[in-house]
Each structure stands twice: as C-alpha cells, then as structure tokens.
C-alpha cells in the first residue's frame, strides 16, 4: 500500500513536470524571448550556463556539457544523500514490516486497515517518513528535465563537435549509447547492492533501464548521450562513496522469498 502511494505520488509529479516541459517542443531553439514559464526560468538559464562555460573552455561545448553536468550533480548531491539515507532507514525496517505482513496476512479490509495502522506506528516509533525518499527526487526532476531541454534546444551545441562525434548528430560508432547503457546498469547494481531483499520489479528494472537508455541514446544527438554517460559515471562514484560499506558487507542482494544460506 505504501509503495503504491509512493509510486502514485512520483507518477503524479512526473506528469506535472512533463506537462510543463511539454508546453514547448525540444525542436524549438531556446532564446531569451521564449514565452513559456518553463523555458524562461528553467531551460534558458541552463542553456546560458552551458554557453558561458563553453566560452570559458575555448568554445568547447562538449567539455561544457561535461562540466555543467558534474556541477549540477554536485549541487543536487545533498538531495541524493538524503534520499539514500531514507531508503536505508526503510530497508532496516523491512524485517519488522515483513513480520507485520505475515501477522496480518488476511486480505479483508479490517485486517488490512490494522496492518496499515501498525505499519504507520512502526514508522513513527523509529522516526521514519515513508515519503521522505520521494521529495528529493521531485526536487531533482525539474532540474534534470530542464538540463535535457537545454542541451537539445541550445542551437550552438548542434554546430560543434567533440572527440569523434558531432554533438548535434547521432554517435556514428554507437560508443556513447553502449557506455551509457553499461553505466546505467552498473549504477543500478550498486544502488541495489547491500539490500537484504530484492523484489522482482527491481530485478526487472535492472535490465530494462539500460536497454531503454541504449535505444534512446542511439536515436538522439550525441550531446544528450554524452550527458547520460557523464551523469551515470558521476552517480556510480557517488553511490560507491555513500554506500561503500554496505556494498562490501553484502555485495549480492538476496531475492525476496529466497532461502537463507
């Protein structure tokens, strides 16, 4: 029930952000005269930041995307730490929550209400907010979606090249899409490591997300693929630094319902 509420809240907020972002097409170049609130106060400032850093680095827009991606990730790092701590606190309560589920296994309404009441009492006892892990994600989302728009709609980016690829064209050798997919897989694997249990949905997403990233990266300009690669590599380092002790203690998560060794 609580998981459904968290997912419902996240999907609702994603819908709001996508609606805001959808007011303007990613094919429309971003300018100071762009009319929408989203463009004027989110996308355009990020586009200007990319352009400013590019000028500082000798008109190198590829390097600018790398540096601005790292800067944004550093700025939202406190939110990520808060999210991971909340997730860790919820994970620590899983054994007690499982006992409550076994105690109130009947599916009738009265039993389920009792289960919900005792679960909430458990959260209050340990000072855990089950929705606390959602809010950092919601704050990050408009920044990351806005940065995606800024990369796609800053016309100067498409006119420059970096390393072996044109930023406005697809990677001709598919190197960036593959690296982006592998980095996504590794980052998710590290996020799941150290968890006592692993539900089937998490295991499925471990494989689905990298495949989706590869497919998207193949079909989008290389500038966006570069952003995904840098962002995921940063998150791998970030996750390892924050969750390092947990990863070393329990490198392979146990599947839910599996037998204990």
Swiss-Prot record:
Predominant location category: membrane
Membrane topology: Multi-pass membrane protein
Cellular component, GO, one term: plasma membrane
Pfam family membership, one: 60KD_IMP
Effect of a null allele: Essential for sporulation, disruption affects the expression of prespore-specific genes but not early mother-cell-specific genes, i.e. cells do not progress beyond stage III of sporulation. A double spoIIIJ-yqjG deletion is lethal. Genetic competence increases about 20-fold in the single disruption.
Transport in keyword set: yes
Lipidation (S-diacylglycerol cysteine): 23
GO terms under biological process: protein insertion into membrane; protein transport
Entry's transmembrane regions: 61-81, 131-151, 174-194, 204-224, 225-245
Lipidation (N-palmitoyl cysteine): 23
GO MF annotations in UniProt: membrane insertase activity
Keywords, sorted A to Z: Cell membrane, Chaperone, Lipoprotein, Membrane, Palmitate, Protein transport, Signal, Transmembrane, Transmembrane helix, Transport
Entry-linked HAMAP family: YidC_type2
Family classification: Belongs to the OXA1/ALB3/YidC family. Type 2 subfamily.
Free-text function comment from the UniProt entry: Required for the insertion and/or proper folding and/or complex formation of integral membrane proteins into the membrane. Involved in integration of membrane proteins that insert both dependently and independently of the Sec translocase complex, as well as at least some lipoproteins. Also involved in protein secretion processes. Essential for sporulation by activating sigma factor SpoIIIG/SigG after engulfment is completed in the prespore, maybe by acting on SpoIIIAE. It has an overlapping, although partly distinct, function compared to YqjG(MisCB).
Subunit and partners: Mostly monomeric, it may also form dimers. Interacts with SpoIIIAE. Forms a complex with the F(1)F(0) ATP synthase in which can be found the alpha, beta, gamma, delta and epsilon subunits of F(1) and a, b and subunits of F(0). YqgA is found in the same complex.
Protein name (database record): Membrane protein insertase MisCA
Species this protein is from: Bacillus subtilis (strain 168)
